[in-house]
């Protein structure tokens, strides 16, 4: 039987904001599910969206798994740079798999409901792998900094123990951020609506729907944002400031070009990841349409992980040669 709160939310979805009083809270059961907005209500558009996102998901899986397989199977790529790249590919696959399969199933079944526990789980993994992506990009920037600014000590500094420690710390910090965020959301007992204006359980959307005072929660969220966003970006900026300063001091144009080319792929991925994320944030702040914001967020949740393998493979001769060797072994 549907509880009173769920019934009221169902009857007044999208046009009524309702929060229980202190007395009513005692007789109201927590909501059992949310409803995701999706990208379009046009039924004729659903098969196209299904085919498009299924194709993008398969390309993302195949591209990133191919990078992982290539790096792990070729001894020429057993270096710190490619170690971080394979971990980034694994994080990208996990990041996309957090949201995209659910959206594909929703399009096919025309059912956009997600359980309360399912929503929290999706949100936790979204924060975990999103933060992990960010921290791994920072570790890769540090690797490039050591390679260009301290080339004679590169092998000594970037030893396997340090590389493993950097990845371990990235996972540990990401878990901390995810659990800290979860602890904030679990305190939100009642919501103004069960409709989430997104195609997945976006953390900011849940906070916007909360009935309780979210001042303290917002402070915690800003702290989480600083850990997962500001600190990694600061580390990347500092690394590239040192890299550019070192390159400009090189006497030969050939040396400058070679040094810049080793950073080209990573810098492209950094600009794509943070640039699209910032673009989505700014567009959602300016646009009054939640659906436009949801469509824009596809760029960093789906498109960026899909393009990363192509960016690294197209600009990297070592990856290309390793892929050809792997292909010849397979055939």
From Swiss-Prot:
GO annotation, cellular component aspect: membrane; plasma membrane
Q: Pfam families attached here?
A: 7tm_4
Membrane-spanning residues where?
48-68, 81-100, 120-140, 165-185, 219-239, 267-287, 294-314
Q: Which domain of life is it from?
A: Eukaryota
**CDD domains noted in UniProt:** 7tmA_OR7-like
Q: Name one GO biological process term.
A: G protein-coupled receptor signaling pathway
Family annotation (Gene3D superfamilies): Rhodopsin 7-helix transmembrane proteins
Which InterPro entries has this protein been placed in?
GPCR_Rhodpsn, GPCR_Rhodpsn_7TM, Olfact_rcpt
Q: Which family does it belong to?
A: Belongs to the G-protein coupled receptor 1 family.
Q: Know the name of this protein?
A: Olfactory receptor 7E178
The species this protein belongs to is: Mus musculus (Mouse)
| Name of the coding gene | Or7e178
């Amino acid at each position: 039987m549907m509880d009173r709160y769920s019934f009221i939310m169902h009857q007044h979805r999208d046009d009524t904001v309702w929060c229980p009083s202190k007395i009513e809270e005692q007789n109201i059961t927590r909501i059992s599910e949310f409803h995701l907005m999706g990208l379009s209500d046009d039924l004729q558009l659903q098969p196209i969206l299904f085919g498009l996102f299924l194709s993008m998901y398969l390309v993302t899986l195949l591209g990133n798994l191919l990078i992982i397989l290539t790096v792990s199977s070729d001894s020429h790529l057993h270096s710190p740079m490619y170690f971080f790249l394979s971990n980034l590919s694994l994080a990208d696959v996990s990041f996309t798999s957090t949201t995209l399969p659910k959206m594909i199933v929703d399009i096919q079944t025309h059912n956009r409901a997600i359980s309360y526990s399912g929503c929290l789980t999706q949100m936790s993994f979204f924060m975990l792998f999103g933060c992990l992506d960010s921290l791994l990009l920072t570790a890769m920037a540090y690797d490039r900094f050591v390679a260009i600014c301290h080339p004679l000590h590169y092998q000594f500094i970037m030893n396997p123990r340090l590389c493993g420690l950097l990845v371990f710390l990235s996972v540990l910090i990401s878990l901390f951020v995810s659990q800290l965020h979860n602890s904030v959301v679990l305190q939100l007992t009642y919501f103004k609506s069960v409709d989430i204006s997104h195609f997945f359980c976006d953390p900011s959307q849940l906070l916007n729907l909360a009935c309780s005072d979210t001042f303290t929660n917002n402070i915690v969220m800003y702290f989480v944002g600083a850990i997962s966003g500001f600190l990694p970006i600061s580390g990347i900026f500092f690394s590239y400031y040192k890299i550019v300063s070192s390159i400009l001091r090189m006497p030969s144009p050939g040396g400058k070009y070679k040094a810049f080319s080793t950073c080209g792929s990573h810098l492209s991925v950094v600009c794509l990841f943070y640039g699209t994320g910032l673009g989505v944030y700014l567009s959602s702040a300016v646009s009054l349409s939640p659906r436009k914001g949801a469509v824009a967020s596809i760029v960093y949740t789906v498109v960026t992980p899909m393009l990363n393998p192509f960016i690294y493979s197209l600009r990297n001769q070592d990856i290309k040669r390793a892929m050809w060797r792997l292909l010849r072994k397979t055939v």
